Amino acid sequence: MVKTPMFHKKIDYISQVDERDCGVAALAMILAHYKTRLSLAKLRDLAKTDMEGTTALGIVKAANALDFETMPIQADLSLFDKKDLPYPFIAHVIKEGKYPHYYVVYGMKGDQLLIADPDNTVGKTKMTKAHFNEEWTGVSIFIAPNPTYKPTKEKKRSLTSFIPVITRQKLLVINIVIAALLVTLVSILGSYYLQGIIDTYIPNNMKNTLGIVSLGLIFAYVIQQLLSYARDYLLIVMGQRLSIDIILSYIKHIFELPMSFFATRRTGEIVSRFTDANAIIEALASTMLSVFLDLGILVIVGTVLVVQNSTLFLISLIAIPAYALVVWLFMRPFSKMNNDQMQAGSMLSSSIIEDINGVETIKALNSEATAYHKIDHEFVTYLEKSFVYAKTEAVQNAIKSLLQLSLNVVILWVGAQLVMTNKISVGQLITYNALLGFFTDPLQNIINLQTKLQQASVANNRLNEVYLVDSEFKDSHQMTEKITPNSSLVADHITYKYGFGAPAIDDVSLTITAGEKIALVGISGSGKSTLVKLLVNFFQPESGTISLGPTPLANLDKHELRGHINYLPQEPFIFSGSIMENLLLGAKPGTTQEDIIRAVEIAEIKDDIEKMSQGFGTELAESGNISGGQKQRIALARAILVDSPVLILDESTSNLDVLTEKKIIDNLMKLTEKTIIFVAHRLTISQRVDRILTMQSGKIIEDGTHDTLLKAGGFYASLFNH
């Protein structure tokens, strides 16, 4: 390991994108020190980051996977007395006495440490050893490349990747630019009208000419406003088309992501990216107009100003470096503030969505005040970040306005002296001053792109953390193997674990033949739900294979697989819309009214629907204006209408009374051609099936019929008898 204790050494700072990214952001900074640049999305996957964040073990495993040597240690402040201490390294801390977090320590000088905090509200800072020791848990991870290490760089989508989105709108952009240029030309003519009045019409008493020119200018202004309307209309159309291209592509990508993505992220973190996408849309629209329109106006008006008076024009050019300096001074602060604001907004959105979804529990626990105070704290934080950004933007705007006003004064000052020496007329001076606004406005627009492009860059980084997660259907076009009818479902020594914990599924093998009715039983946490999610390929086993007939699931198109194996989760979701719309979601093509009636009869929900005011047209709310049992039965009928050969019911009758459940099980047992896997807590179901698989600690410990397992007197018998 190489020692790099210099305080002045350049740090490749990388901030966390979401609340739980501090561990992978710290690792990303270490990797960047050794010239490897990977997205946080990639590192999250390697480190098995979950809702709780990244463990030290996860950081070690991720670094090892990237050909780095690691040495995690438990130490105290005496660590910093070592002369050959290798920097940088990762330190685990507890911030504010309650938040687990990571720092990257880059060096030490005297009593101060150079720290990089992934939380960009702190960023790169110096911290005394005493302060550091108050937060430090003593856990440190030293990371250095192996001899075989080679730097790698992951390709990311930059803002330039949106150029094709822009070029698709080229005809629209051309029309907008033409309309805007014509609007500007009319305004320039208006400025010369003022010069004509002062220098020509009034001194020469040209009343008739003045009337004709005035009426002509009024007509020109009518045309100008029509063109302004056309320009604004086309801008709205372009904004909507950009929204379709950017936001809908994001939504499409979200729907194609694997379940593991949603299992490790809060809903608000995903939803907040829509706001990020809007920042990109605004920046793209502004950039297009500035490149084609503002530059064009700048050239045209600049030429007119030179013709008016070259001396005044040279003075006007002073504005360019002055504006550029103001923009440059604010670049870094704006970048940090944009990121802070977006991250705070993401956390606030997450909390609001979670609390609204869990409002019944909040009320049941009488915890409204606690929930409110949590959101209140996050909202105040968001307002503080927004206020700091708005305040800084106001300061920058004030400086720009001061430059503009000062320039106007200087132009009038110098221009007045030129008038006094008869080098220009009063009308020319007033016209020049009026035209100057048409020069400085597009100039400001071009320079103001900095703020919007910075917002877009931050937003693009946040979007990248989603786009860089591969679609689970990425290789579907290469999947040419088809499912063989009446195939058995076979798991061969499969193992799966969440993160780096103990296996949730541990060396499981099983075979389920076509048409068989199976019950998976066991206590909570035994691995039943995880196993069936592996069977439908929501997750992929870390070792072993699952096959449908002769074909491994990994070689099958996931759309085709999930059309063959239908999974009904523990908590069925009812969507806003009518009962009929909910029933037909995912239904096989060509579903008839008879099929629907048959499905609701099997699910024992037909009578309930007919008693409702609008029958099948009854509108259901997202949260459900029906009972939990009715939800489960509608969801079951919906699953039956998919008409898949294999149906997995994950405790899908848990909210039903025993009598209704028995009727439904009787109906399902009559579906002799269908393979059904019941995940059950109630052992009444297990008495009806062909075979029972008993699970414990991720293993299948028993396999047999109800009678044989009772006679064996094992774990199943113990569960049944109790």
Curated annotation (Swiss-Prot):
Residue positions binding ATP: 522-529
Main location: membrane
InterPro entries listed in its UniProt record: AAA+_ATPase (IPR003593), ABC1_TM_dom (IPR011527), ABC1_TM_sf (IPR036640), ABC_transporter-like_ATP-bd (IPR003439), ABC_transporter-like_CS (IPR017871), P-loop_NTPase (IPR027417), Pept_C39_ABC_bacteriocin (IPR005897), Peptidase_C39 (IPR005074)
GO cellular component, as recorded: plasma membrane
EC numbers, comma separated: 3.4.22.-, 7.-.-.-
SMART domains: AAA
Residue ranges of every copy of the ABC transmembrane type-1 domain listed in the record: 173-455
Subcellular location: Cell membrane
Membrane topology note: Multi-pass membrane protein
UniProt-listed GO biological process terms: protein transport; proteolysis
Domain Peptidase C39: 16-143
ABC transporter domain segment(s): 489-722
Record-linked PANTHER family: ATP-BINDING CASSETTE SUB-FAMILY B, ATP-BINDING CASSETTE SUB-FAMILY B MEMBER 6
Xref: NCBIfam families: bacteriocin_ABC
The name this protein goes by in its record: Mesentericin-Y105 transport/processing ATP-binding protein MesD
Source organism per UniProt: Leuconostoc mesenteroides
